[in-house]
Each structure stands twice: as C-alpha cells, then as structure tokens.
C-alpha cells in the first residue's frame, strides 16, 4: 500500500460468489490430484494462460535439450521476420557447412550445397522434420556463421532471464547445450505468446516434402524433370500429433547423453497446457520414441483430467476517497484485467473473493498505484491474489483545496480521537 495513506484503517469487504466455469459446472467434492509416476528425469507441466506449474519433478536439473534447442533457433528467426529484417521468401544460400552429408545418422531436411531454398522452407525443415542441416543454413543466413548465431542464442537467453540456458550449436547435437525443464517450459510459453501462428503453420504440420523440383540446383534439374522428380516426404517427429487430441506442438529431441526429450503443448476446452519431459531412457530409438509419447500423453491427461480453467466475475469495489487532490476520488481497476485461475476440479464451485482496499489516500496518486487487492479462495484456502490499482492519475489540488482538506482532516482527527 502507498506510504501516504491517511491511517491504517482499511476497509475490508467480503464478497462470496460462485465462479462457474464456462465449459460446465462441477458439483463433486474437490479431491487431491492422484499421483503421477513418470520415468523422465525432469518434468514440468504448466498452464499456458497463467504460467502456473501444475506438476514438477526435478524441474531445475540441468540437462542437454537435444533438438529442443531448435526452438531458440526458430525464435530468433521469427524475431527478425517480425522486425521486418527478414522475409519468408528470402533465398537462403546452402553452404558446404549446411550439407546434409555432414550430419549422418541424424534428423535432416536433406539440403545440398547450392539448393534454391527460401527462409520459409528452412523453417519447415527445422520445425517439422528437425533438420540439423536446416538449422545450420538458417544460422549462417541470419548471423553469417554458426559461431556468431550461437552467440546470439546465448545473448537472447540471458536477455530473457533464462540463466540455465547455454548453447553451443543451433541444432542441439552437442550434449554441451544445457537447459532445465522449468525454464524451458517458461520459454515455450513465451514462444507461443510471441509467435502464436507458428503452431498452425509449422509445429502442427504432420509432414514435409523436400526437395521439390524448383529447389534443385540447375545441374540436378538438368538430369531430371518435374514429372520424374520425387521429393523426400518425412513425417513430423512429434507422434502425439496423430494420437493425442488437441496437440499442436512443439518439439522432440534425442541425444544419447540425455535421452529422449519432449516439449509438448495441447489445447482442450479453452485450456492450453505445456509439458516438458527431459531424460527419458530407453534401449532403442523405437522404444524411446514410444516411451516419450506415452509419458507426454500421460502428463497432458493428468493435467486435463484434474484441473480446470476458471474466469471468475470480479467482485464489487468502491472508488477511493482522495484528499488534497484535483479530484475527490479515484477509481480502481484490476491490474492486468480480469483474472484467469487454474483450480483442481471440484474447487471451482467453492470459489470466493475478499476485496481489501484503501478507504482514503492523500494526493498525488499515480495511475497504476496499488490501492487494494482481491484475494481468491477455494475450499477456504487462498488460490490467487490480484492487485487493484488506480485507474487514473490524481495530481495535487490547488493551494486552497489542500488547505481546506487539511482543515477537514484535522477536524475529523480531533473528533475521532
């Protein structure tokens, strides 16, 4: 609260109300979510709307991300596109460094030096089929060299506050790349917020075919024809796109040192979840892929089955009396707008709100200054708080206004002793 409040007396208005979920009403008594048994070394399940962590297991263990690294590579590309510094139609020069032959036994777009390819196609080659060659081509296109691009990746991670992130390449093949599940879930949430179209345009696409005839070098075009040429069609590495309703991203990964990794997101009934699972161990690629999909599905189902998104009505609150100001009162508004809450199923019917706000304050009052709060509780336990702030600025009044209010305050204080 502001240090210039008149006296410690604070008005407390208790407003109890039912918060009905938009998708239905639940009458069953609230029960604790059942235990979740996952083999992954590190796990985080996050609600997208609120950033609330619903489940965690060793969330701060530092682990190699493998191809989850490519999400940072894509993020930097989208930033340049959105800033007008790059276009999806820009041609990309495929150097010897980006030749698919340099990355045997790994995920590839199957680029060859001299291919006629665009930024948009490269992005698909990274997001859909996890091309390590495509990641190098994009890094060189943006920064001139892989080393310069890696420096950009680490600078961006530092600027965003992700202290566990460390990158040494744009594709994730090295075990020296580092993340934690907690920070990567936060990054995935930010990625979707900043680049929401990437889900429909890239991450949820189930297959990608390359090279098309027009991508071939003139020398390769000379020995075939559009009718004869057959591109390589590959499926998205995220098998949950086929098997789990609502999944539309994000990225899979594997390196031997870490195991099988997954960053997955799904939306059902207005609720979007983000799951990060790192370090799933298996004896073979098929086994690891199957375990990764099974654990990802189990994590998402646990979240959707046990939690619900609630958008409660805001309770009533009153303007605050302003003394010695150009106006006699200031209106309140919720900081950040109406809240979204995530509750265990069964608790939404017991949701209540307590409004605590200042009775009066001495000018000046700054717009956005905290003057109260709403405390949400379910089943008698606090679940969230929301600040109430000044909706407008109230500067000090003129000399006679301040003098008159000072006299009135003195009179009030004299008779209230």
Language model regions located:
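Periplasmic/cell-envelope proteins involved in peptidoglycan metabolism and beta-lactam response
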Residues: 2-5, 154-157, 415
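Active-site-adjacent loops and short helices of periplasmic peptidoglycan-processing enzymes
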Residues: 30-194
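Bacterial N-terminal signal peptides that target proteins for export
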Residues: 2-15
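Domain-terminus/edge residues, biased toward the C-terminal soluble/receptor-binding domains
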Residues: 162-163, 175-179, 183-417
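C-terminal segment of classical bacterial N-terminal signal peptides
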Residues: 19-29
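Helix N-cap / beta->alpha transition motif
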Residues: 3, 118, 341-344
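Catalytic-site microenvironment of enzymes
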Residues: 15, 103, 218
